[in-house]
Regions:
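Cytochrome P450
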Residues: 190-199
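Cytochrome P450 catalytic-core helices
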Residues: 114
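Short glycine/proline-rich turn/loop motifs
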Residues: 24-31, 87-98, 182-187
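Short, solvent-exposed loop/turn and secondary-structure capping segments
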Residues: 74-77, 162-166
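Short, compositionally biased leader-like segments
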Residues: 2-42
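Short, conserved catalytic-motif segment at the N-terminal edge
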Residues: 35-102, 126
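Short, charged, amphipathic alpha-helices and their helix-cap/turn boundaries
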Residues: 85-90, 166-189, 214-218
């Protein structure tokens, strides 16, 4: 049955003893009543997380929930490795914890957009300005007029990196930025939408860094 779940349905195996794969950082979690919530509210949220985990779609789920700046939930369920559909039976199982790094990618787009609008509210940027106004090197290869707004709206004309770029390069922000500065836009018609799945975040991060001197990952 486990073989069918993994190889046919591409699902993770769910242990009978769920407590054995749950990690709760009790030292970080505050009493929910201190921020106007009930214990029942937290229990309901966590019960729904468990329901999602029990589908087997995700080998691990981590939850970090804050209210009024205080941590209400800092929890994890499942395995960081060893129980995924592609893992071999002899792969050592490693429990996920609240500290386990998770690759967010598009989930972080909302955070980046909020930061850009906060900078705009503070008068540090204008989203209608060209990216090159803040990062002149971005103007290479005909990108001098591409605006921050166009990048936010996935209309910047640079939806992807060159095909021969190694995924490992994405861990090097400076190297990726240099690639983006040297890439030619595939279109200049801002009415055309092309999802900037990866590229937009690197461009906006660089604007944030140029304006504030801070790294978005700091």
């Amino acid at each position: 049955m486990e073989i069918i779940r993994k190889q046919v349905l591409h699902l993770s195996a769910i242990p009978r003893d769920l407590d054995s794969v749950i990690t709760i950082d009790s030292a970080k979690e505050v009493d929910p009543q201190s921020v106007g919530m009930l214990h029942a509210d937290v229990d309901k949220i966590w019960d729904n997380v468990i329901k999602v985990y029990k589908t087997g779609v995700h080998p691990a789920i981590t939850v970090s929930l804050r209210r009024q700046g205080k941590v209400i939930m800092s929890r994890a369920i499942g395995h960081a490795r060893g129980n995924g559909p592609a893992d071999h039976a002899n792969t050592p199982k490693e429990l996920a914890t609240p500290e386990t790094p998770m690759c967010l990618f598009s989930t972080s787009k909302a955070v980046t957009a909020v930061l850009m609008h906060m900078l705009a509210e503070d008068g540090l940027i204008n989203v209608m300005d060209p990216v090159s106004f803040y990062a002149p090197e971005f103007a290479r290869k005909g990108k001098g007029n591409i605006t921050i707004h166009q990048i936010l709206a996935h209309r910047g004309g640079i939806p992807g990196l060159p095909k021969n770029v190694s995924l490992d390069t994405l861990w090097d922000e400076d190297a990726t930025w240099e690639l983006l500065c040297n890439v030619e836009p595939i279109m200049t018609d801002v009415s055309k939408l092309a999802y900037h799945a990866i590229t937009g975040g690197f461009v906006l991060e660089r604007v944030i860094r140029k304006v504030t001197g801070e790294n978005i990952n700091a």
